């Protein structure tokens, strides 16, 4: 898995091998990572036992000998950032297509990005908490050449009007982003927080990965568009029925008073 912003595959031309294998429908497919061993082992066990063909797309990052201990860190960060989402597809799970595709092994599968709380303390001793989304841009910070893709913003230029957390920025319609800039929180060796701006290429990679993750979510039912639409329709119908009953009771009550 590569997040090189200069790679054409980063901009919507990536071959999603796991999803391509799912398109065959009559095969067991697992997209797994060495960082999530329980999911990986379960996938191997199921795939080996099934009579169907099996396909395993496993993330095992290549690291140098001196950084071998970072293999699990990089693999885990790739999963967390939705750069390499986990899933399994098993035709034997049921006749309904939705029952065959599972994404529950992913961190916070119902969310766009995993959200974590970071406790911070200001220079005057005030304590607070930051809600941080983990995106592909956060994953890319682990790269040796990360400095090529970010710009550190001096604190005196921090503006709440023009600087938005990347996750919030990506939710905006493109027409509303002309006067906004996305940023990430990072921390230096002195444990001082910084805001850094990802370049446009990396920002668009995040947008593409969010779109790919939404596709996987929809397949897995963790954030299904049609399910949400049906729930909203049922809620609206229930509210309408409640309003109707209240109106009938008010009319009845008024008639009794008269």
Language-model features, listed with the residues they occupy:
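ATP/pyrophosphate-binding catalytic subdomain of soluble kinases
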Residues: 37-65, 74, 78
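Flexible, low-complexity linker and terminal segments
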Residues: 62-258
């Amino acid at each position: 898995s590569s997040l090189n912003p200069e790679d054409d595959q980063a901009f919507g031309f990536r071959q999603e091998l796991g999803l391509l294998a799912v398109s065959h429908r009559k095969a067991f497919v697992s997209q797994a990572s060495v960082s999530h061993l329980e999911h990986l082992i379960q996938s191997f066990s199921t795939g080996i036992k099934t009579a169907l063909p099996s396909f395993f797309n496993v993330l095992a990052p290549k690291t140098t000998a001196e950084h071998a201990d970072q293999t699990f860190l990089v693999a885990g960060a790739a999963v967390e950032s939705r750069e390499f989402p986990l899933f399994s597809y098993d035709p034997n799970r049921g006749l309904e297509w939705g029952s065959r595709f599972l994404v529950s092994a992913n961190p916070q599968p119902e969310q766009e990005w995993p959200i974590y709380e970071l406790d911070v303390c200001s220079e005057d001793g005030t304590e607070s908490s930051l809600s941080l989304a983990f995106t592909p841009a956060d994953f890319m910070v682990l790269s040796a050449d990360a400095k090529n893709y970010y710009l550190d913003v001096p604190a005196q230029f921090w503006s709440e009007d023009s600087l938005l957390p990347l996750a919030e920025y990506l939710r905006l319609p493109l027409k509303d982003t002309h006067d906004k800039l996305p940023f990430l929180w990072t921390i230096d060796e002195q444990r001082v927080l910084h805001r850094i701006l990802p370049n446009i290429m990396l920002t668009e990679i995040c947008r593409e990965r969010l779109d790919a993750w939404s596709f996987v979510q929809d397949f897995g039912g963790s954030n299904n568009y049609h399910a949400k639409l049906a729930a909203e329709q049922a809620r609206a119908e229930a509210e309408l029925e409640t309003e109707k009953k209240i109106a009938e009771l008010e009319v009845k009550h008024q008639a009794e008073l008269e």
